[in-house]
Amino acid sequence: MTDIIEDAVEALREKMSKNSFDGTAKFEIEGEGSIVISENMVYTSDEETDVTFKASVEIFQEIFNGELDPTSAFMTGKLKIDGDMGTAMRLANVFG
């Protein structure tokens, strides 16, 4: 596991410890790997999920650090979303 993935998993675990999420989501970080959130658990995996977010390392770092709103990233084409948009919106509220 790369340092970038390890840092992202840690950042997501911290966010999820303070919030509730009742779905599954995958973050595909270009050139690094994938992270899954299932309920409030965060781990590395490439399993199928309700929704998948795809972006570069830089974009995910900005989102995880609270520097970039996920909705803005999606609307400007920096973040790609495949799957259930309702689940995507619920998870975006966690980052809100």
Predicted region positions:
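Feature captures hydrophobic
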Residues: 1-96
